[in-house]
Regions:
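Ferredoxin-like iron-sulfur electron-transfer modules
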Residues: 1, 228, 287-290, 351-356, ...
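Residues forming the flavin
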Residues: 1-365
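Short, surface-exposed secondary-structure boundary micro-motifs
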Residues: 308, 475-477
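Iron-sulfur cluster-binding cysteine motifs and their immediate structural context
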Residues: 396-413, 430-446, 475
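Short, well-ordered loop/turn sites that connect or cap secondary structure elements
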Residues: 463-465
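Short beta-strand-centered aromatic/proline hotspots
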Residues: 478-492
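Short, solvent-exposed secondary-structure boundary/capping segments
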Residues: 490-504
Length: 519
């Protein structure tokens, strides 16, 4: 079995097949295996079976350890330059080109970043979001100091937050689309840090002679053309582009696999087993359609099981039982507001019939007069969680984290979290640290006369110290009141998410959502 690509899909497929007795060999053009996982320092969504609340790079480490355990051979710095219908590949390793013939081939080459053409787009300082992640999270280099992000999908939102974690200033986030494209919880944690969102805006030009010194954006109309007089200038040294991905399917086309043009790119036509139109050639992960890494790992396992059956290492009954199990996991991830069937559509109500926050879609944060309508936001005496998760997304770690049963989601993991008023919160903070979207806060009024406390997730360095005085910012990233740090907690179970507690006036405990130290 030959696997092309040592990312989440490729490694998962190789492991699945190796468990059944196959001897997979995996080729990857990079110096390290793991694909995009090692760039991803954020916690994943989903449930336990999807590695929810585990950081991406740790999932990568687990996959590599499992691949080693089952004897998967991984060849690095090896670029596959040819794939042929007879299940043959040519691989460039150093100065040599080698030829391999397999009994089955899985293509898991992933995707490449899209670019946008505008005046000055080739200047040094214009980079892709993936490049920014590589610089920060693999090489520990700041991509720039003042950055404008173009793109409000999950990649743009997550990378914007990581840029701030790396010490960069994100001066604005723009997107030509009229609505935020990614998860609202990702947008909210960027907005409360003070980053303004400019929806229905795109880049007109980048300024600077030899490198980026500024950028001009403008508002687009219904015809996607710039509206005269709407230009806005920002002093920046870096422009980061997060405008989608395209499947890297060239090898599949070379192998004469039947392809399909979709809005997501040029993808192979595959059956439920990952099999293409060419017998013995399979595809999994982003090369067969752009999704999250969690989905890619499941697709990889499905293809690995299918190849094991194709080569006689599993019966069809065993394969189908395994595929049914994995399909169930995959279907779970494809539910909710961001399900494939809803792409490009405006979903106006949650599954519970609650009006979605238009402010969240248009500005990146839920307005104060909207937040109260959601079931995770309640007023109680004593310390209690406030869950500002307002969209149906597949995620339930908060329910599992609370050992007192204060939080309930139910069997459908896309249901909005709700608070059980009959259960007593003990303020352990496990729900706060476990929330992949950082949307849970602990609130308590009357800690002392006229003042309450808000406990929030915090992942920035340097950490504030107890006694520090600063300001509390609201959901919109603007000043709401003075604040004092009263507690900072950490624990191995929090996985580097600190719990920062600030003291604010009682009437601000439902508004203060971020702490900023006084300059």
């Amino acid at each position: 079995m030959i696997v092309i690509g040592a990312g989440p899909a490729g490694l998962s497929a190789a492991i699945e097949a190796a468990k059944k007795g196959l001897k997979p060999i995996v080729f990857d053009e990079n110096a390290k295996p793991g694909g995009q996982l090692f760039k991803q320092i954020h916690k994943f969504f989903g449930s336990k079976e999807h590695k929810a609340k585990v950081r991406g790079f740790k999932i990568g480490q687990e996959l590599l350890a499992e691949a080693e355990e089952y004897g998967v051979e991984v060849v690095l710095n090896a670029t596959v330059v040819g794939l042929y219908p007879e299940k043959e590949v040519t691989v460039k390793v150093g100065d040599k080109v080698k030829h391999y013939k397999g009994d089955a081939v899985l293509v898991a080459t992933g995707a490449s970043e899209n670019m946008v053409n505008f005046e000055g787009w080739t200047k040094p300082g214009v980079i892709g979001a993936g490049a920014a992640q590589t610089m920060m999270n693999l090489h520990h280099i700041k991509p720039g100091n003042r950055i404008l992000m173009l793109g409000s999908g999950n990649v743009g939102l997550v990378v914007s937050y990581q840029l701030m974690q790396a010490g960069c200033e994100v001066v604005a986030l723009a997107d030509a689309a009229p609505r935020v494209g990614g998860y609202g919880v990702h947008a909210a944690k960027v907005a409360r840090c003070g980053v303004p969102f400019y929806l229905s805006h795109t880049i007109i030009r980048v300024e600077g002679d030899d490198y980026v010194t500024g950028v001009v954006i403008g508002q687009v109309g219904p015809d996607w053309k710039i509206i005269p007089g709407t230009e806005k200038h920002f002093d920046v040294d870096t422009v980061c582009l997060a405008v989608g991905l395209s499947p890297m399917s060239q090898l599949l086309k070379q192998a004469e696999v039947r392809m399909n043009d979709t809005k997501g790119g040029h993808v192979p036509v595959c059956d439920k087993y990952g099999a293409t139109s060419v017998p013995g050639i399979y595809a999994a992960g982003d090369v067969s359609g752009i999704e999250e890494a969690s989905s890619a790992m499941i697709e990889g396992r499905m293809s690995g099981a299918s190849i094991a059956c194709y080569l006689g290492y599993m019966t069809e009954e065993e394969r189908d039982a395994r595929i049914d199990e994995l399909e169930g996991q995959l279907d779970t991830l494809r539910q909710g507001m961001f399900a494939p069937k809803n792409r490009g559509k405006l979903v106006e109500k949650t599954e519970e019939g609650i009006d979605v926050s238009m402010n969240l879609l248009n500005k990146g944060y839920v307005a104060d007069d909207e937040i109260e309508r959601f079931p995770g936001v309640t007023h109680q005496k004593g310390i209690h969680p406030v869950i500002e998760c307002t969209q149906n997304i597949p995620c339930n770690p908060c329910q599992d984290a609370c050992k007192k049963g204060c939080i309930r989601i139910g069997k459908n993991i896309t249901s909005l979290p709700a608070i059980d008023p009959d259960k007593k919160c003990i303020g352990c903070g496990m729900c706060v640290a476990s929330c992949s979207g950082q949307s849970i806060f602990l609130v308590e009024e009357d800690v002392e006369e006229g003042y309450g406390e808000v406990t929030m997730p915090y992942e920035f360095l340097p950490l504030p110290e107890v006694g520090d005085k600063g300001v509390a910012l609201g959901r919109n990233g603007k000043y709401v009141c003075e604040a004092e740090v009263t507690k900072i907690r950490t624990a191995p179970a929090f996985d580097h998410t600190y719990l920062l507690t600030i003291k604010v006036p009682n009437d601000m405990v439902m508004k203060a959502r971020f702490y900023k130290k006084e300059a």
